[in-house]
Regions:
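Chalcogenol-based redox active-site neighborhoods
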Residues: 1-192
Length: 192
């Protein structure tokens, strides 16, 4: 199945996830207390960044997951929810978060697509069953506005994800290397 692309509707999902927040601050008697359900149903006007990594307990993946947490307030300021997903189960996510210093306090849920339905529907499921390293920016109408898939050895750049989100939310023509606050392209003025 080909990767869903710009203009396609993002598939509906309901996934079990490890709750956001500092795991040390959560009062829980058992691992299940650390789990929640995340879905594609979001408040009106909300954008989403849904990013996938191939596998827990690897090397590049935790650097990306932590990096997506760093600009959390920037995403919130843009009315954008962030959800991280892999095909590992929620117990594996929980164990990884507990054991990795940079993952213990994440401001977004780590979701499990254990049955691989979402991964497959998006066209990012590998023959080995893992998800590709993929990022989707989804507008408030549930339409994919940006897709990026990178090699396992290459981590993503969250500043670039924010830049793309700014450009998409500007609803203007934005030149290469455009940054929020910079002038956009006046196509009508150029056609003159």
């Amino acid at each position: 199945m080909p990767v869903l692309t710009i203009g396609d509707r993002f598939p509906a999902y309901e996934l079990t996830a490890v709750v956001p927040g500092d795991l040390k601050d959560i009062e829980a008697d058992r691992p299940e207390d650390y789990f929640t359900t995340v879905s594609s149903t979001v408040p009106e006007g909300t954008w989403r960044v849904v990013f996938f990594w191939p596998k827990d307990f690897t090397f590049v993946c935790p650097t990306e997951i932590a990096a997506f947490g760093d600009p959390h307030e920037d995403f919130k300021d843009r009315d954008c929810e962030v959800v991280g997903v892999s095909v590992d189960n929620e117990y594996t996510h929980y164990a990884w978060r507990r054991s990795h210093d940079k993952l213990q306090d994440l401001p977004f849920p780590m979701a499990s697509d254990l049955n691989r339905e979402l991964t497959e529907a998006l066209g990012i499921k590998r023959a080995t069953g893992e998800a590709d390293r993929a990022t989707f920016i989804i507008d408030p109408h549930n339409v994919i506005q940006s897709v990026s898939v990178t090699a396992d050895s290459v981590g993503r750049n969250t500043e670039e994800v924010l830049r793309q989100l700014d450009a998409l939310q500007s609803d203007e023509l934005c030149a290469c290397n455009w940054q929020a606050g910079a002038a956009t392209i006046d196509a009508l003025g150029q056609m003159g």
